[in-house]
C-alpha cells in the first residue's frame, strides 16, 4: 500500500529507526537495525484491533444495509438515492481494502504481500477514498439545485449515472500516478526479529518511489487540493447557501402561513443543524490525516518526531478518516424517516396489520426521496416522456418553504397515491 492511506509507508524509514533501547520494538547494531515483527506491546495492539474492528463493523453493516434497501425498494430508485448508493459502494471499498490493510500496517513491520498486491491495494484504496469524497460533493450539488433553485429542473437519472461514471473516472485518473510509483522495496539496513531465537528476516516496504522529493510534494499537493480542499470548499459553500435559503423562507408569510411558522422554524433549525453536522464531520475526520501527509512531505521533522508520528499519530488519523465511511450511512440514511420505512419494508420488520389511513401515508411516503444529512425531497409524480423531472418545486407560492417541508421528511398535503 502506498504512503497515502497507511502509516508504515508514509515516510522514509532510513531516519525513523534509531537507538538501542531494548524497551522499544527495535535494536541497533553497527550496520544493521533490528526491529520486532510486532510494532507494539500486546495491549496497544489490542486497542488498535478493537478500534479498527468497530469502525469496520459499522462500515460494512451500515453501507450494506443502505445498498440492500435502495436495491430492494423500487420506489427508492431516484436520483439522490443513486448517489447515496454510490456513496455506500465507495465506503464499502474503503472498509474492505483500506481498514484491514491499514490496521495490519499499523501493528506489524514490513509489507507481507507481493508487488502486484502492493499496486492493486494502493490503487483501490485511493480510488475508493476519492470516489467517496466526490460523491459527497455530488449529493451536495443535487440538494443545492433543489433548494436554492427550486424552479430549475432536477437532475435526471441519466445525468446522475453520467455523474457517477465521471466520479469513478476522475478518481481512477487522480490515483493512477500513485499506483505507478508504488513498489515493494527491500530495506538494506533493517531486519525483522521473528522470535526470541535471534531469527531475522528481510524487511520489505510497499511505498511510492518518486524520482525526487519535489515530484512527491507536487503530487501530494494535487491530491490535497482535489480530494480535500476543493470538495470541502464546495460542500461548505453549498450547504451554507442552503441554510441561508431555508432561513429566509418564512420572512414574508401572511394568513394561514403564520399558523405554520412555528413548525417551519423548528424544521429550519433541524435542517441547518444537520447541514452543519455533515460539514463539520467531513472537516474533522479528514483534516488530521491530510495535515500529517503534508507535514511528512514538507516539514523537516526530527527522527524522534517522525517515529512518533508514524507509529502512534498516523494510526489515529487513519482511524478518524475511516470513521467518515462508517458514519455516512447513519447521516445520509438512518436519520432519514423515509429510509427507515424502506428498511422496515425491505426486511419485513412491520408485523402489525396496516390500517387504511396508514397505508395511504406509506404510499405517500414512497414518493419521497432520501436526501443528504437525513433530509428528504419529493420525487415528482409526473415526468415528461423523456424521463426528465419537471422540477424540484411543489408550490409556486413559496417553493423554498415547500422544499423545506419535504427536506425534513414531512408529507405535504398531496393527493397523489
From Swiss-Prot:
Glycosylation sites (chain numbering): 8, 20, 31, 198
Disulfide linkage: 118-206
GO biological process entries: cellular response to hormone stimulus; G protein-coupled receptor signaling pathway; neuropeptide signaling pathway; regulation of MAPK cascade
Membrane topology qualifier: Multi-pass membrane protein
GO cellular component: actin cytoskeleton; plasma membrane
Cytoplasmic-side segments: 67-82, 141-160, 239-274, 332-417
Membrane-spanning intervals of the chain: 46-66, 83-103, 120-140, 161-181, 218-238, 275-295, 311-331
Annotated segments matching region Disordered: 378-417
Lineage: Eukaryota, Metazoa, Chordata, Craniata, Vertebrata
Naturally occurring in which organism (per UniProt): Rattus norvegicus
Coiled-coil intervals, chain numbering: none
SUPFAM superfamilies: Family A G protein-coupled receptor-like (SSF81321)
GO terms assigned for molecular function: G protein-coupled receptor activity; neuropeptide receptor activity; opioid receptor binding
Function: Receptor for NPAF (A-18-F-amide) and NPFF (F-8-F-amide) neuropeptides, also known as morphine-modulating peptides. Can also be activated by a variety of naturally occurring or synthetic FMRF-amide like ligands. This receptor mediates its action by association with G proteins that activate a phosphatidylinositol-calcium second messenger system.
Gene3D superfamilies recorded: Rhodopsin 7-helix transmembrane proteins
Keywords: Cell membrane, Disulfide bond, G-protein coupled receptor, Glycoprotein, Membrane, Receptor, Transducer, Transmembrane, Transmembrane helix
Major location category of this protein: membrane
PANTHER family attached to this UniProt entry: NEUROPEPTIDE FF RECEPTOR 2 (PTHR24241:SF132), NEUROPEPTIDE RECEPTOR-RELATED G-PROTEIN COUPLED RECEPTOR (PTHR24241)
One Pfam family of this chain: 7tm_1
Entry's localization field: Cell membrane
Entry keyword annotation includes Transmembrane: yes
The protein's name in its UniProt record: Neuropeptide FF receptor 2
Similarity-based family: Belongs to the G-protein coupled receptor 1 family.
Topological domain ranges for the Extracellular compartment: 1-45, 104-119, 182-217, 296-310
Amino acid at each position: 500500500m502506498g504512503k497515502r492511506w497507511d502509516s508504515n509507508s508514509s515516510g522514509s524509514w532510513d531516519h525513523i529507526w534509531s537507538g538501542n533501547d531494548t524497551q522499544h520494538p527495535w535494536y541497533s547494531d553497527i550496520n544493521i537495525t533490528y526491529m520486532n515483527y510486532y510494532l507494539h506491546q500486546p495491549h496497544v495492539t489490542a486497542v488498535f484491533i478493537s478500534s479498527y474492528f468497530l469502525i469496520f463493523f459499522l462500515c460494512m453493516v451500515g453501507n450494506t444495509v443502505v445498498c440492500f434497501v435502495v436495491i430492494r425498494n423500487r420506489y427508492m430508485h431516484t436520483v439522490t438515492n443513486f448517489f447515496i448508493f454510490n456513496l455506500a459502494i465507495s465506503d464499502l471499498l474503503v472498509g474492505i481494502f483500506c481498514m484491514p490493510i491499514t490496521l495490519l500496517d499499523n501493528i506489524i513491520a514490513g509489507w507481507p504481500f507481493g508487488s502486484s498486491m502492493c499496486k492493486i491495494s494502493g490503487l483501490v484504496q485511493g480510488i475508493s477514498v476519492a470516489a467517496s469524497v466526490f460523491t459527497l460533493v455530488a449529493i451536495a450539488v443535487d440538494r443545492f439545485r433543489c433548494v436554492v433553485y427550486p424552479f430549475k429542473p432536477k437532475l435526471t437519472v441519466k445525468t446522475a449515472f453520467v455523474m457517477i461514471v465521471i466520479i469513478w473516472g476522475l478518481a481512477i485518473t487522480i490515483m493512477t500516478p500513485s499506483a505507478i510509483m508504488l513498489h515493494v522495496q527491500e530495506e538494506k539496513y533493517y531486519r525483522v526479529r521473528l522470535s526470541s531465537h535471534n531469527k531475522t528476516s528481510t524487511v520489505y516496504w510497499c511505498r511510492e518511489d518518486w524520482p525526487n522529493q519535489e515530484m512527491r510534494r507536487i503530487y501530494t499537493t494535487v491530491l490535497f487540493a482535489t480530494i480535500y480542499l476543493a470538495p470541502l470548499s464546495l460542500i461548505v459553500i453549498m450547504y451554507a447557501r442552503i441554510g441561508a435559503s431555508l432561513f429566509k423562507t418564512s420572512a414574508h408569510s401572511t394568513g394561514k402561513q403564520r399558523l405554520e411558522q412555528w413548525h417551519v422554524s423548528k424544521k429550519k433549525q433541524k435542517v441547518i443543524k444537520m447541514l452543519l453536522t455533515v460539514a463539520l464531520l467531513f472537516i474533522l475526520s479528514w483534516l488530521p490525516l491530510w495535515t500529517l501527509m503534508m507535514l511528512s512531505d514538507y516539514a523537516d521533522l526530527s527522527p524522534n518526531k517522525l517515529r512518533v508520528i508514524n507509529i502512534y499519530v498516523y494510526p489515529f488519523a487513519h482511524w478518524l478518516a475511516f470513521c467518515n465511511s462508517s458514519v455516512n450511512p447513519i447521516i445520509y440514511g438512518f436519520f432519514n424517516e423515509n429510509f427507515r420505512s424502506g428498511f422496515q419494508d425491505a426486511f419485513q420488520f412491520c408485523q402489525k396489520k396496516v390500517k387504511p389511513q396508514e397505508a395511504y401515508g406509506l404510499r405517500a411516503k414512497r414518493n419521497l426521496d432520501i436526501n443528504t444529512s437525513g433530509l428528504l425531497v419529493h420525487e415528482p409524480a409526473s415526468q415528461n416522456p423523456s424521463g426528465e423531472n419537471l422540477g424540484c418545486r411543489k408550490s409556486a407560492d413559496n417553493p423554498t418553504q415547500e422544499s423545506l417541508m419535504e427536506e425534513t421528511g414531512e408529507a405535504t398535503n398531496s393527493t397523489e397515491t
